[in-house]
Amino acid sequence: NRIVCPTSNNHVLILRATDENGNVLPEFEKLLDIDIKAAAEAALGKTLEQNLLSVVFDYDGNLWFATGGFRIYPQREQQGVIGYIAHAAIDAILRGEQANLSEAVFVHELTPGEGAENGIAASKDGAVILTNLNCYLLRAEDGVRVVWCTPYESAGAKVSGEGDKTTGGGLAWGGGCSPTLTPNLVMFTDNQDTVNLLALDMKTGEVAASHPVLDDLPEGYQVAVENSAIVYDNGEGTVSTIVCNWFGAGSAGLADPNNDSSIQSYANIYDINWLTKGNVMIAPGVERVDTVKTADGYEMKSIWCRNDLSDTSILKLSTATGYIYGYVQDLNTGMWQYIILDFETGETVFTMDVSNKYGYNNMAIGMYAGNSG
C-alpha cells in the first residue's frame, strides 16, 4: 500500500499515502529516496549520459530500473544501463536502517547508444526490458544475469513526410512498445517500415511467431505502436493481442541532438498540432491479432482491424465484459468521447460524448477500470 515512483531527477521514491486505517494522508510521507543514477554510475564506474526512465518490481521484490528516453538514437552513443536494487536493501531502508548501496545496486552495461524507450515488465521468470535494439530477460542472481538477449529490426525514428496527413511522428527510435507477458510468451512490436507483432519464447528468447500489423491504412498515414499492447491469454492455447497506432503524436523536436526525451512533458515529447487540433493529427489503426499454439509451435492471424479509429487513451480490456474501452474524438463533430469496442468483432457498441464543448483531449492519459466496474 505504498506508492513507488521514479522522478525526473533520477531518484526513486517510496511514499506512504494512507494511515493505518486507510485514510488518505493530507501530505504523503517519504519513506525511501534513492538517487538511482548516482548509485548506478558508482556500480558501473562510468558516467551515464541517459536518465532514469522506468522502474518495476520483480516477483522477489527487487526493484529493476532502466535508463533511456522516448527516443534513443544509437548513433549518438549515449551510455545507458539496466539494473536493480536488491530487495534486502529496500526493506532495510523502509525499516529505518542504513543500507550500503554499493553492495545492493547491480547493473548491466548497455552498448553506447542503446537504451529503454518505454516500460519494463516482470514475471516469475524475471524482468523483461525492451531497448531500442534488443529485448532482454534478466534475473537477479547477486548481479544481473542476462538469460537471453534477442535483437529485433527497426527502420529508426519515423517522421511525417510530404503527403502525410500528420505533422508529428513516432516517439521511439525502436519498438517503443512496452513488452507484455504471458506465462510462455513475450509480446511486443518492432519498428520496421511495416510494423510486426513479435512473440518471443519466454524460456529461450527465440521468435516463436510474427505478423505484420496495421499494414492496410488509408493513404497518407504511417505506423508507430508506442504503447503497451493489450494481451489476453485464454488459457486454451490462444493469446490475443490488441495493438494501436500512435503515429503523429511525437514531436519533431525529438530529433534535436540536445533533446532529453526522458522528460515527459507535453511540450517536450508531443506534436503541437496534435495538442491543439486533436485526433485528426493522429494516424488511425487498432488491430487484434491472435497467436495460436499449434503442434509445431505458434502461428499468428489477424482477427479484425479498425482503420477508422485514432485512440489516444491506451485502450483497456475487461475480460468480465468482453469489451475494450477507449477515448477518441468524433472527427465530424469534434467532440471527445468514450468508446466501447466488442473484443470479438472490433465493432463499436457504445459511445458517449464527455462534453458538448471542444478541448477535452485527454493527452494520452490511460483508461482505468475500478473493481466496482
Which sequence ranges carry the predicted segments?
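Repeated scaffold domains used in trafficking and secretory/extracellular systems
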Residues: N1, A39-V56, P112-S123, W173-S178, ...
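Asp-box/WD-like beta-propeller blade repeats and closely related beta-sheet repeat scaffolds
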Residues: S8-D60, A66-A121, K158-T166
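Surface-exposed loop and turn segments in beta-propeller and other repeat-based domains
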Residues: E29-T47, G96-G113, V147-L171, S210-Q222, ...
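Short loop/turn segments that connect beta-strands within beta-propeller blades
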Residues: A17-E20, I85-D91, R139-G143, D201-G205, ...
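Conserved beta-propeller blade signature
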Residues: R2-P6, N62-A66, G126-L130, L185-T189, ...
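Short glycine/acidic-enriched loop and turn motifs that connect beta-strands
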Residues: I3, N9-L13, G69-P74, N134-Y136, ...
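Loop/turn-rich, solvent-exposed surfaces of beta-rich toroidal or solenoidal domains
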Residues: L185-T189, V195, N227-Y358
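Long, internal scaffold/assembly segments composed of regular secondary structure
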Residues: I120-N234
